[in-house]
């Protein structure tokens, strides 16, 4: 009985080891060689030093992402960037020829940007300098080929950077006025008389509705830009397709916010209390869903155009004549 039990166990298949993600697999393979181990240790040391130098920048990121709904997607951006880097690692290891000159240049620019913000407190300079520092570490220890391959993953980190307040309001204020005017035209055209004064809409009965910055489209624009850029990168389509998809983030965000203001206007004309509190929150969720539906419809239309542009098949040659 014991012998049969042992033989049965011996005949059972050995468990298949789980494969590491490509990015981690490259790190593991690099650690097995002396040069690769030296490069990994140096990169880790530089990364730790960069985190210490930009500690206030990293804390600022977390604070803004946690408190400002315009940048609540910031927590996802580094994770998506890692996903893109893992995708790039699927193509195998790059030729590891450290680009010392380029790496030192990028790290020097990052350090200068960080020091400049101590003298002149311009937060975005430090934010972008941190990304430049990451690129410098890649170039210094992995080379130009690695920087080229993982360049998009690094560049995508730009979407986690909060805009300066002055720049944000410079963009948001015209969008507020644009959304207000378009919404007023639609409300008047659908039978609800509205007087538009800047970003204030006066409804029948003297009810006044204020189109706030949250309804300007900036909140959706920041998220949609990151989303459309990610989708464009993942979509195996022509370059013009990807550029159109990224550029459509602006009209999609504006259209969704105009629809929200129009819906709010009709509800406030019926009962202003219904447009407050919980409904306003639900309305924001519906707005995001509406924007995603617009993007999905746009992709469907663009896909039809791409399909129409594809050749129907290889040209057939006439059969050679007999004899």
Model-assigned labels for residue ranges:
Residues 2-323:
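Hydrophobic N-terminal alpha-helices or hydrophobic patches in metabolic proteins across all domains
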């Amino acid at each position: 009985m014991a012998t049969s039990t042992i033989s049965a166990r011996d005949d059972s298949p050995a468990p298949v080891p789980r494969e590491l993600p490509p990015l981690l697999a490259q790190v593991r393979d690099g650690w097995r060689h002396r040069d690769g181990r030296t490069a990994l240790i140096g990169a880790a040391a530089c990364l730790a030093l960069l985190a210490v130098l930009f500690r206030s920048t990293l804390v600022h990121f977390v604070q803004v992402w946690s408190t400002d709904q315009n940048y609540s997607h910031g927590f996802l951006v580094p994770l998506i960037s890692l996903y893109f880097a893992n995708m790039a690692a699927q193509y195998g290891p790059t030729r590891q020829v450290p680009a010392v000159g380029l790496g030192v240049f990028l790290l020097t620019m990052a350090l200068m940007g960080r020091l400049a913000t101590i003298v002149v407190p311009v937060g975005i300079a430090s934010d972008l300098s941190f990304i430049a520092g990451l690129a410098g570490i890649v170039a210094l220890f992995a080379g130009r080929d690695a920087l080229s391959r993982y360049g998009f993953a690094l560049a995508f980190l730009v979407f986690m950077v909060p805009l300066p307040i002055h720049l944000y309001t410079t963009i948001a204020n015209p969008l507020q006025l644009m959304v207000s005017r378009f919404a007023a035209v639609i409300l008047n055209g659908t039978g609800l008389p509205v007087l538009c004064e800047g970003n204030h809409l006066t409804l029948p009965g003297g009810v006044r509705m204020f189109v706030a910055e949250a309804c300007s489209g900036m909140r959706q624009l920041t998220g949609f830009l990151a989303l459309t850029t990610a989708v464009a990168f993942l979509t195996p389509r022509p370059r013009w397709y990807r550029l159109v998809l990224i550029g459509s983030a602006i009209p999609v965000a504006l259209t969704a916010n105009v629809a929200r203001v129009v819906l709010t206007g009709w509800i406030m004309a019926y009962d202003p209390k219904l447009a407050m509190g919980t409904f306003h929150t639900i309305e924001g969720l519906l707005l995001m869903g509406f924007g995603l539906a617009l993007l999905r419809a746009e992709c469907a239309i663009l896909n039809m155009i791409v399909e129409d542009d594809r050749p129907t098949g290889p040209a057939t040659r006439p059969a050679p004549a007999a004899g």
